[in-house]
UniProtKB/Swiss-Prot annotation:
Belongs to the Antp homeobox family. Labial subfamily. Keywords: Developmental protein, DNA-binding, Homeobox, Nucleus, Transcription, Transcription regulation. Residues 166-184 have a biased composition (Low complexity). InterPro entries: HD (IPR001356), HD_metazoa (IPR020479), Homeobox_CS (IPR017970), Homeodomain-like_sf (IPR009057), HXA1/B1/D1 (IPR046327). Sequence-specific transcription factor which is part of a developmental regulatory system that provides cells with specific positional identities on the anterior-posterior axis. Acts on the anterior body structures. Residues 87-146 bind DNA. CDD domains: homeodomain. It is found in: Nucleus. It comes from Ambystoma mexicanum (Axolotl). GO terms for cellular component: nucleus. Residues 140-184 are annotated as: Disordered. This is Homeobox protein Hox-B1. The lineage of its organism: Eukaryota, Metazoa, Chordata, Craniata, Vertebrata. Its main location: nucleus.
């Protein structure tokens, strides 16, 4: 967050309360050498305990709590944009409604265009990545079922054709049937 409360520093001077820690303001303390770049303030008497900002904003305390909270904020922001570590990703528990809609879509399309993925994600209140990964996993599941012989490999059209062929065979005699089966 942004510092909002003024505070006093040990040895005099003022600063801002940031994350519960008083930090030195760099406005007056920082100096600009002839090369034009800001350098850490020499007036920072407790320099070993703080990181002085090079852009004239604020010096930050190196307390573990503050570093930890800044790291958490950074990690959260990175993960919002899909740049965070995959180790911390949480397993998505899809609702029954979400699963039925995803399965319905998968029945018609094994692969989604980006536009369709965005549309489905918005409708089901998921993000694009969740929809994309669900479809990848579902295709792998289908492939595994086909390999094990538990699902037809032709997709929905193949199932309809198989059902049609099965009904044709039941209404007409099999070429392999015995002659006794015809004399009823």
């Amino acid at each position: 967050g942004t510092p909002t409360t003024a505070c006093s520093l040990p040895g005099g001077g003022g600063g801002w309360l940031w994350g519960g820690t008083c930090v030195q303001a760099m406005g007056r303390g920082g100096h600009r050498p002839s090369d034009g770049h800001l350098s850490p303030s020499p007036c920072c008497a407790f320099f070993s305990r703080c990181l002085c900002c090079f852009f004239g904003l604020y010096a930050l305390s190196t307390s573990l709590a503050l570093i930890s909270s800044l790291f958490s904020l950074l990690t959260a922001k990175l993960s919002e944009y899909g740049l965070g570590s995959q180790q911390n990703s949480i397993r998505t528990n899809f609702t029954t409604k979400q699963l039925s809609e995803l399965e319905k879509e998968f029945h018609f399309n094994k692969y989604l265009t980006r536009a369709r993925r965005v549309e489905i994600a918005a409708t089901l209140e998921l993000n694009e990545t969740q929809v994309k990964i669900w479809f990848q996993n579902r295709r792998m599941k289908q492939k595994k079922r086909e390999k094990e012989g538990l699902a037809p490999s032709n997709g929905p059209q193949g199932r309809a054709r198989e059902a049609s062929e099965a009904s044709d065979q039941s209404s007409s005699p099999s070429p392999y049937a015995s002659p006794d089966s015809f004399s009823s």
